[in-house]
Swiss-Prot record:
GO biological process assignments: aspartyl-tRNA aminoacylation
Positions that bind L-aspartate: 172, 218, 457, 498
Full protein name: Aspartate--tRNA(Asp/Asn) ligase
Record lineage: Bacteria, Pseudomonadati, Pseudomonadota, Betaproteobacteria, Neisseriales
The UniProt record lists the keyword Cytoplasm: yes
Length: 602
């Protein structure tokens, strides 16, 4: 029987006989003495096998990397000069008495300690990849976070309740994953994008405080921080307002970071959505980067420079500046790369001014400002730009001029890129945890393609008090009782106070151009139950995958999920999704269209 984990044997076990079981991480033959580094989930221990124990020596001699061994031996100090203070087991070794080969292993597709492996190779051989210490650490931390969440919410009186995985499709927002019903031919279940409606119904049912760590599914285009199936920390409360809900969930985040990382997150400042977009161009600003937008739209309405004037006069246009301290040293090549970068977000170019001498702000050839655009701007505008941005000698000022959405996304992304690349060396990046709440979101945003307003969060979010009439009269300025928790530029949680009155919910549906008939067909079960004395309620959902990605510093969300999908929504380990035979399709009353069938065969 195993007595100890490999990585947990320390000096306290000196002269004791122990039995460890694990995988051969490395095997070395040093002049007739064999050394084996044996690995299990807790780490590595060094085992010494000498010829005085011939059976153990023969077993060790036959072992290769990834063989599974059971080793019994005596714990002793390592020789002087061979210790490793970074490991719990770094000062001891095991002198083997007995070795049993529990299983041989084929040569693995890569070495466990190889750090230069392509992601495709790793995902195809995910089981071997999961043996790597970094992956073991990531998934252990994920477990610690999940358990910390459970402990905290249990102590706060929350009840863990499961909600259905097979539910009805409500095609609003992202596409649903559909599951055909064999019993009801031609009808489909949908996998839940979130437990939203069920958790609201649990509040109507009187459970008061609910939580669940659950899988959710969205059939959407994938990015580095997205998966078709993801894990959500979901919670809902009755009779609490947004301040009280934010206090509870902020406390949870602080406790989890303290327990898992030993980190004190400190205060969570609150920032209105309008301020976040005005200064940072993002509703999830990275506050580690001390760079802000400077508004120039009003100034450019009287300038002749067409690029800036056109954006300033455009309906929904915006002109901003982004001052970067010590940025005048950026090379032409670097600026060209930044220009190409903002093009990803729809920007047609990237104007800039290098500030060489703030004492000479003319627009002539001897100007202290260096840029192709200086001659097109009035001296008054140049002075105002320098005054508003607070630019000093040696700085560079970048400009965004276009539709507000393009400017916010392009210059917002540039702010992050420049901040991460140059901020630490130039004093405008702080490498620490910077949490905040973003509040007072718009209730609606206009969808030009659909030619109607859509919900910014979801259609069950309550309007801010005093804004109910604006849903009809001025939907663009109607604010929601919504809040997002943001950490270092990532939205890790989002929530809102919900609508608990059926008449208000019907008004929101009407503002979204959802007819009474469609309301009843899609959401009749919600509207009907809201009429039976629904309490005021609200909640929040955290993305567990994103949270753990941040906490581990992993490059990809796929590094904190045991068996993730690729960016093409495939599992390379199991080759899912896969074809099914005609018999299965017939049982489901389905038939592939000819084009789809031909594509599969190809």
């Amino acid at each position: 029987m195993r007595t100890n984990y490999c990585g947990l044997i320390s000096e306290q076990y000196l002269d004791q006989t122990v039995t460890v079981k694990g995988w051969v991480h490395r095997r070395r033959d040093h002049g007739g003495v064999i050394f084996i580094d044996l690995r299990d989930r807790e780490g590595i221990v060094q085992v010494v096998i000498d010829p005085d124990t011939p059976e153990a020596f023969a077993a060790a001699d036959s072992a290769r990397n990834e063989y599974v061994l059971s080793i019994t031996g005596r714990v002793r100090n390592r020789p002087e000069g061979t210790t490793n203070d970074k490991m719990i087991s770094g000062k001891i070794e095991i002198l083997a008495k007995e070795i049993e080969v529990l299983n041989a292993a084929a040569t693995p597709p890569f070495q466990i300690d190889d750090e230069n492996i392509s992601e495709n190779v790793r995902l195809t051989n995910r089981v071997i990849d999961l043996r790597r210490p970094v992956m073991q650490r990531n998934l252990r931390l994920r477990y610690q976070v999940a358990m910390g969440v459970r402990r905290y919410l249990d102590a706060q009186g929350f009840i863990d309740i499961e909600t259905p995985m097979l539910t009805r499709s409500t095609p609003e927002g992202a596409r649903d994953y559909l599951v055909p019903s064999r019993v009801h031919p031609g009808e489909f279940f949908a996998l839940p994008q979130s437990p939203q409606l069920f958790k609201q119904l649990l509040m109507v049912a009187g459970f008061d405080r609910y939580y669940q760590i659950t899988k959710c599914f969205r059939d959407e285009d994938l990015r580095a921080d997205r998966q078709p199936e993801f894990t959500q920390i979901d919670l809902e409360t009755s009779f609490l307002n947004e301040d009280e809900i934010m206090d509870i969930t902020e406390g949870m985040a602080k406790q989890v970071f303290k327990d898992a990382l030993g980190v004190d997150l400190g205060d969570f400042p609150r920032m209105p959505y309008s301020e976040a977009m005005f200064y940072y161009g993002s509703d999830k600003p990275d506050m580690r980067i001390n760079l802000k937008f400077t508004e120039l739209t009003d100034l450019m309405k009287t300038e002749e420079f067409k690029v800036f004037r056109g954006a300033a006069d455009m309906k929904g246009g915006r002109v901003v500046a982004l001052r970067v301290p010590n940025g005048a040293k950026f090379s032409r090549k670097e600026i060209d790369e930044y220009t190409k970068f903002v093009g990803i977000y729809g920007a047609k170019g990237l104007a800039y001014i290098k500030v060489n001498d703030v004492g000479n702000l003319s627009n002539g050839e001897d100007s202290g400002l260096q840029s192709p655009i200086v001659k097109f701007l009035s001296e008054n505008a140049l002075k105002e730009i320098i005054a508003r941005t607070g630019a000093q000698n040696g700085d560079i000022i970048f400009f965004g001029a276009d539709k507000t959405k393009v400017v916010n996304e392009a210059i917002g992304a540039l702010r992050i890129k420049v901040g991460l690349e140059h901020g630490k060396d130039n004093g405008y990046f702080t490498d620490e945890w910077k949490p905040l709440w973003v509040v007072d979101f718009p209730m609606f945003e206009y969808d030009e393609e659909a030619d109607r307003y859509v919900a910014v969060h979801h259609p069950f979010t309550a309007p801010k008090e005093g804004h109910e009439d604006l849903m009809v009269s001025d939907p663009a300025n109607c604010l929601a009782r919504a809040y997002d928790m943001v950490l270092n530029g990532w939205e890790i949680g989002g929530g809102s106070i919900r609508i608990h009155r059926a008449d208000v919910q019907e008004k929101v549906f009407a503002a979204l151009k959802i007819s009474p008939e469609e309301q009843q067909e899609k959401f009749g079960f919600l509207l009907d139950n809201l009429k039976f004395g629904a309490p005021p309620h609200g909640g929040l959902a955290f993305g567990l995958d994103r949270l753990v990605t941040l906490m581990t510093g992993a490059e990809s969300i796929r590094d904190v999920i045991a068996f993730p999908k690729t960016q093409r929504a495939q599992c390379l380990l199991t080759n899912a999704p896969n074809s099914v035979d005609d018999k299965q399709l017939r049982e489901l009353s389905l038939r592939l269209r000819q084009k789809a069938a031909e594509t599969k065969e190809a």
